[in-house]
């Protein structure tokens, strides 16, 4: 990543700078940058620095402090050769860190010894970091070189929640020099029963693991003490990516190549069976789980490339689902057609739709049109043909009267709805296509509706709906003459 640098200006070139920096410049010169003095008729003079001078990384700096504010803090340890605050290349925003180089190596050693994790600057939660920059650590400055943090930082779990940092230090100090000891706490300030301990060397950390991991059970802990190396940044990133991939797989099963569809569909149906089993035990399924179950049911209804999905068995409150086998269906009728798109049938392979699944013996109620009485019911009303009473068994009992049906669908040859019925959707995942859009908006008619009421209902329910790491933005399509001033 390219980082824009903002470099310290050591003051204007005037008489004061002459006495402070010892470098001559005329009163009319433009300024003094990084120890360079400029005179109208003289070449620039570069201050000397030791051949083994150390470039320091400074972290945990308040973002409102620039070079001139930081200079007095570091000047007391020696003459500064260069001080640079890191800023974002595009936004120019302060990154909260800087690079510092002294003219003399000893000045860097003194600054690190006096400041590193010894002082917390105003507005910061952690003490200032003063250590060699990565390039220096890989180079010849061996006296300041340290092993990577992940090789000597330990995660400690199953602690007594009453233990403090001092208690943890006493437990681990027998194995070496402890640089950091931090107990993880919740928003209320109470301990979570785990901590991070950083040693000065990898060997010390390994010795602590060998001696303490599983060696004892702390009072109030459910199992023995856990001592292991903390996850690296790369491992944490990989775990987050796996979680994101799992979310995308749940909300976008159509993105999976159809060559391996059979095994994937079978796994989906196993997940659906588990969801429905939980319904049978608890009698209620939250809206997100109901939506996931509906997608699984739709996937089961697809018969792509001659591959048959695994059969689904209805689950009741007091029985275990038996195994059912059914022949593949070569073709499935298409009961729903919207704007030329073929709808997804609710049944496949002779299996009953999810209305046949009972929750603790509660029989399904007829699905109703969305009403203003329950916003969540509006959002998932169209899913009821698949999720049935599993989503809202209580709401079905309260709403028993019939509601008028919406006007008939627009003719298939019309590709765009009338004014006020067309939606513009932002932030869709790149792999989304027509099939995914239809699957997502089918409960409301489709993206292009035949009446403004359905369009407004879809906007209220789906605007802000999260898919993976994206949130949908749904709004009315602008009229064609919206940009005209008259």
UniProtKB/Swiss-Prot annotation:
Keyword flag Cytoplasm: yes
Region annotation (Disordered) ranges: 18-39, 121-149
SMART domains: RRM
Span of domain RRM: 54-135, 152-232, 406-479
Major localization class: nucleus
Tissues of expression: Expressed strongly in skeletal muscle, heart and adipose tissue (at protein level). Expressed in the brain and cerebellum.
Domain of life, per lineage: Eukaryota
Compositional bias ranges of the Polar residues kind: 18-28, 138-149
Keyword field: Activator, Cytoplasm, mRNA processing, mRNA splicing, Nucleus, Repeat, RNA-binding
Subcellular location: Nucleus; Cytoplasm
Family matches, as PROSITE patterns: RRM
Ranges for region Necessary for TNNT2 exon 5 inclusion: 239-258
Region named Sufficient for RNA-binding and MSE-dependent splicing activity: 1-298
Listed Pfam families: RRM_1 (PF00076)
One annotated GO molecular function: mRNA binding
Gene Ontology CC annotation, any one: nucleus
Alphabetical GO biological process terms: alternative mRNA splicing, via spliceosome; excitatory postsynaptic potential; in utero embryonic development; mRNA splice site recognition; negative regulation of excitatory postsynaptic potential; negative regulation of mRNA splicing, via spliceosome; positive regulation of mRNA splicing, via spliceosome; regulation of alternative mRNA splicing, via spliceosome
Family classification: Belongs to the CELF/BRUNOL family.
Purpose of the protein: RNA-binding protein implicated in the regulation of pre-mRNA alternative splicing. Mediates exon inclusion and/or exclusion in pre-mRNA that are subject to tissue-specific and developmentally regulated alternative splicing. Specifically activates exon 5 inclusion of cardiac isoforms of TNNT2 during heart remodeling at the juvenile to adult transition. Promotes exclusion of both the smooth muscle (SM) and non-muscle (NM) exons in actinin pre-mRNAs. Activates the splicing of MAPT/Tau exon 10.
Protein name, per record: CUGBP Elav-like family member 4
């Amino acid at each position: 990543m390219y980082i824009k640098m903002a470099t310290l200006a050591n003051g204007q070139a005037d008489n004061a700078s002459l006495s402070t920096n010892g470098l001559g410049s005329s009163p009319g010169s433009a300024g003094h940058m990084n120890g360079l003095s400029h005179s109208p008729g003289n070449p620039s003079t570069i201050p000397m620095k030791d051949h083994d001078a150390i470039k320091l990384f400074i972290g945990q700096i308040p973002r409102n402090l620039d070079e001139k504010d930081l200079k007095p803090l570091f000047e007391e340890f020696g003459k500064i050769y260069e001080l640079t605050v890191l800023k974002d290349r595009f936004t120019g925003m302060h990154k909260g860190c800087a690079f510092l180089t002294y003219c003399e190596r000893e000045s860097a050693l003194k600054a690190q010894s006096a400041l590193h994790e010894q002082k917390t600057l105003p507005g910061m939660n952690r003490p200032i970091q003063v250590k060699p920059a990565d390039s220096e650590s890989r180079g010849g400055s061996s006296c300041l070189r340290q092993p990577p943090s992940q090789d000597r930082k330990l995660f400690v779990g199953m602690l007594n929640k009453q233990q403090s940092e001092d208690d943890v230090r006493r437990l681990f100090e027998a194995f070496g020099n402890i640089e950091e000891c931090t107990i993880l706490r919740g928003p209320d300030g109470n301990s979570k029963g785990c901590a991070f301990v950083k040693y000065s060397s990898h060997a010390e950390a390994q010795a602590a693991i060998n001696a303490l991991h599983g060696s004892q059970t702390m009072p109030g802990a459910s199992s023995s003490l856990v001592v292991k190396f903390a996850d690296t940044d790369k491992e944490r990133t990989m775990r987050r990516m796996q979680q994101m991939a799992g979310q995308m797989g749940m909300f976008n099963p159509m993105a999976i190549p159809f060559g391996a569809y059979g095994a994937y569909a079978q796994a989906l149906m196993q997940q659906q069976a588990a969801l429905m089993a939980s319904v049978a035990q608890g009698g209620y399924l939250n809206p997100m789980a109901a939506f996931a179950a509906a997608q699984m049911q739709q996937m089961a209804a697809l018969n792509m490339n001659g591959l048959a999905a695994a059969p689904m068995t209805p689950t009741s409150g007091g029985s275990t689902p038996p195994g059912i086998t059914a022949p593949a269906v070569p073709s499935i009728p298409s009961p729903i057609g919207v704007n030329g798109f073929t709808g997804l049938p609710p049944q496949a392979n002779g299996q009953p739709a999810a209305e046949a699944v009972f929750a603790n013996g509660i029989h399904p109620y007829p699905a109703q049109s969305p009403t203003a009485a329950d916003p969540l019911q509006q959002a998932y009303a169209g899913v009821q043909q698949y999720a049935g009473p599993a989503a809202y068994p209580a709401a079905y009992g309260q709403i028993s009267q019939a509601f008028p049906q919406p006007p008939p669908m627009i003719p298939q040859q019309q590709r765009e709805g009338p004014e006020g019925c067309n939606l513009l959707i932002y932030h869709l995942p790149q792999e989304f296509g027509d099939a995914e859009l239809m699957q997502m908006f089918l409960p409301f008619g489709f993206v292009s509706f035949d009446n403004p009421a359905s369009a407004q209902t879809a906007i209220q329910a789906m605007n802000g709906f999260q898919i993976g790491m994206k949130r949908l933005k749904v709004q009315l399509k602008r009229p064609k003459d919206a940009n005209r001033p008259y």
